[in-house]
Amino acid sequence: TKTQTLQEPVNTPDGIPNENGNTPAKENSQALARLLKVQVSLDGIAGHELRGHSGSSCLQVDINLQTSPQEPHPRVAVVISSDSGKIIGSGYCDEGAIGANDDTGHALIRYTLDQLPLNKGRYRIGVYLLCSKGRYVYEWTDPLAHIELKNDGQHQGPWILGGNWASYP
């Protein structure tokens, strides 16, 4: 599991990750938002190695984080990658959606993806804590968990495409 908290500025002219995967940190990044606890569940079972079924399993990611009054509300992304690390998809919370639940700046949020549209296979689940515009990464954990999905169908590729088939004259 790779966990990274940016504490030293990384100088790149455009804010894009450099060859080490780092993005520039803002000044005093220790006082900014941070992940406190993240839990991944598949079909109501929490863990780091989870098993489910394509098209019917429900993925939930519960995130407890620390916000900062000096910084605009952060954003969180849940990233699904292949077992080799290739990003397949991501879900970002809306800008301004995270606010502190109490005086200490703690916030609790949940990401839910019902009826997982992923085909059979093994996938990584990662969580990224970003600045309010989604440009800078404060902290990430990837992989946080792995999910293994089974499917009895003949589908090809990582996604099971929805849609309807109909015959017509």
Predicted regions and their residues:
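Localized sequence-composition bias
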Residues: 1-169
